[in-house]
A protein has these predicted regions:
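Generic recognition of short, well-ordered alpha-helical interface segments
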Residues: 21, 38, 67, 132-136
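A conserved amphipathic terminal alpha-helix motif
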Residues: 113-147
Length: 147
């Protein structure tokens, strides 16, 4: 199964962490969208519109900023989900995956792709700021899941 876009991104970034935390616990934290702020300091307010499934909308407000509307575009229960934000002609696509590494280890992967009109300029300008907190956010996620 191809988790990535068919369109070639103009900017991409991926970060992964390995953990002994239970995959089910990580998935429960991901699927509990209303409580993402417990492990993601980059969220001031968040609202899930509909069930956590393909087509769901998520209104996420970073501290001191306007809300960002995300749409869940792919979801494999217990394995992965992808959300997209659109700004003009730009598409910011983030895929979150759980990769089993054996019975008691998991690789947690976040991947962002920025594509669309103007992405070759905008991607390098905005992408690093958006993904800068991923190492801390992912560390907090797996730490909470391990409890």
């Amino acid at each position: 199964m191809n988790f990535w876009s068919e369109e070639a991104p103009m900017w991409e970034y991926e970060h992964a962490v390995e953990t002994a935390a239970d995959r089910g616990a990580i998935w429960r934290l991901w699927s509990d969208v209303e409580n993402w702020g417990a492990w993601n300091g980059g969220i001031e307010k968040i609202e899930l519109r509909g069930p956590f499934a393909e087509g769901a909308e998520i209104a996420m407000t970073p501290p001191g900023e306007d809300p960002v509307l995300l749409r869940v575009t792919a979801l494999g229960e217990g394995e992965h989900f992808t959300d997209e934000a659109r700004f003009g002609g730009l598409v910011l696509r983030t895929t979150h995956r759980l990769v089993p590494l054996g019975e008691d280890r998991t690789r947690v992967v976040y991947r962002m792709e920025i594509s669309g009109e103007g992405a070759e300029e905008a991607g390098p300008q905005i992408g690093p700021g958006i993904t800068a907190d991923w190492p801390e956010t992912m560390a907090a996620l797996v730490e909470l899941a391990a409890r």
